[in-house]
Amino acid sequence: MRVCRCEIKCRSSSSCGSLKGETVSAFRSKRKLLLILTTLIIALVLAVYFLRESLPTNVFLWTSSLLTSLKSHMGNSSSAAAVLGVLQTAYEQSQRIAYAIQPQDNQTLISTPLTPASAPAPMLPPTPITSSRNRSEQYVMMIPDQEDVLSSAVEKPQFACDETNSPNYMIYCQGELLHAVMMLNIFKDSKTFVDKPLKRDPEIVAAEFKDQFPGTITSNDREAVREFVNANFNEEGHELEECELVDWQKEPEQLLSIEDPDLRQFALQVNLIWKKLCRTIKKEVVEHPRRHSLIYVPNEFVVPGGRFREFYYWDTYWVIKGLLASGMHQTCKKMILNFHYLVDTIGFIPNGGRVYYLRRSQPPMFIPMIYEYHMATEDDEFLLSMLNSMEKEFSFWKNQRMINVTKNGKSYAVFRYRADTNVPRPESYREDYQTAERVDRQKKRKLWRDIASAAESGWDFSSRWFANRKTMDTIETSDIAPVDLNAIMYWNMKILAHLHGALGNVERRDELNRERSRFVDTFEAVFFDDREGAWFDLNIRTGERDDDAYPSLAVPLFTECYSSLNNHMMVDVLETLQRKGLLQFPGGVPTSLMKGTNQQWDYPNGWAPINHMIIEGLRKSNHPIMQQKAFEIASKWINRNYQVYQKDKKMWEKYDVAKGYVRAAKGGEYENQAGFGWTNGVILDLMVTYSKRVTVIPSERQTPRQPSTSSDAHVVAAAEIADLTLGKLMQRSSLRAISSFLKCHG
């Protein structure tokens, strides 16, 4: 500011330094140029970070030319140089992100130097670049090479698919074409490319790409690569077609039992969405499997929706819960048969229905799916046909995802997520590559493995997996033994034992029950924290429990993973959920309390499966207080879904549950998706479960409601009593803790 005042008041003063002799108008002209440049670069940064799209190359070149010209005009002004330095850094960073550029020691990104020239550079923008490999490469931006992806110096690369499990691996999981398409940012969503079916066999397309692009690929090749993709690939989703659900009913009996008229109508509208989400695989996938990234299954299935065009593993459990509420037993059976087919042909159930998911799974919900179907149908013949597949899936997790940990000097076998890949995920290749730019080369393999492992967890992504609780580059998923995964594996043991017993296989039932009993002791020793009164993830690297508040700590209630002698644990867990602040929000339970991470499995986002497991875990207890709390959370979640549907006429993948105002959620690698399979399943299951009690919030009511009945008054009174009792219970629990402390230290 001092320089500016000096220039205006005393242009001839010696204190004016380097500005002496200049005119006010000349300085104002420079200031205007600086303002224009600042605005342009800010716009570039915003466009790159928020739009996530590549901008026309000439925009960057024009900005570069303006930077060069302005720097030469500014002379020796230190203030201007400092500002220009900041702008230069911001410009280069936005340029790198837009084109996924990794600076090389022997490479300049732009041929025009940014040092003062002997004569002012022209202010006109350069000639726009055209897409041709034969044009002059005056302005070249190199895409980063694949050295870190392909190198075996630290650890041999393990790709999402290769010649051992997918004949089209050179297109969809690795290779020059995949790398170029992702680094050139051809598509806004990385998943778009790897979902596209080929028009010809993969070997031919890969060879032709190498012939057409033999040298180093640069930003000049963007349009040529785009044209190559358009010429050799069909549209994503081309290999799937909508199908008819033969057992769909317009007015399922269970949905008609919902007493609240607005919620009943809402349930029937959600029931309609099943028809829009049904998919079957076209014959061309069977005839030419190598031309598709889609994994073939024989029967129709319900997809999540949006960018998720294929089936997904753990989603299907909650889809089946909703289909059962809609009375669609045959569709449930067919979807289970698809997974039976995958276990028989692949050996496990992958994350989803694409070849790039073949090296990771998702939370093991196959056995619970069969249990839910059998409970609804009592189809013993079908159950018998599923036994071998259930045992094989159970063995996969025991053999591939178990690890020994030490706690208090004793060794325990527990489960963890650990994907069998250590390179960028094909469906998020560009994002993973850029994340790894911030870490040492020696750590990139583990970083990529832990990113894929977080995707295997279903929580992709959450601060729960980050060492610093903030940024993806500190992810350490494979170093964590998750409390919810281990609780689900306990549930698998319990269900498998029960189903064997139902079929008269007493010996196997007893064997599984003994294993389950031992695992309960392991679970309590490894995960339960007496001071906190809840179960928490174990960090294998540090040997310590992570006591940050995540609703996963309530999953053992859902799977009933606790000793019958320790029922007080359930009340302690409810108290912990309350004390940590997870139950205070108007729309349900958020996936964490970590703010500012911009990850979709963090605050303020709530997800259907997490809310469902918490609600069901509390509801299945024998404690009236916990059952009442389950109803309260269910009412919040149902009303938030209902409110957003009235506003958007859509069901969403996730919801903002923390705000008083109503909206779908944000955050993560991709935009919130509509559909949505498991959201629909959970909402229908909960509305049927609480069909006699749950109501729309009065301010949101669409249909006039009849005057309150005595049963309504009873529910209100019960709620008030439960709240009062909860307060007393928490008081007693606190006194008990103090008493215990005094006994130990008195």
Predicted regions mapped to residue ranges:
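Short, low-complexity, Lys/Arg-enriched N-terminal segments of secretory-pathway carbohydrate enzymes
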Residues: 1-30, 76
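N-terminal signal-anchor transmembrane helix specifying type II single-pass membrane topology
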Residues: 16-61
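Ser/Thr/Pro/Gly-rich low-complexity linker/stalk segments immediately outside membranes or between
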Residues: 53-83
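Extended glycan-interaction surfaces of carbohydrate-active proteins
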Residues: 122, 145-310, 334-353, 407-480, ...
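Alpha-helical support elements that line or immediately flank enzyme active sites
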Residues: 312-342, 552-564, 612-624
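Aromatic/His-enriched, Gly/Pro-containing loop or helix-boundary segments
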Residues: 343-386
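Inter-helical turn/loop segments and adjacent helix faces that build the functional surface
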Residues: 373-385, 496-511, 620-628
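Short amphipathic alpha-helical coiled-coil/interface segments
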Residues: 390-393, 509-524, 630, 634-638
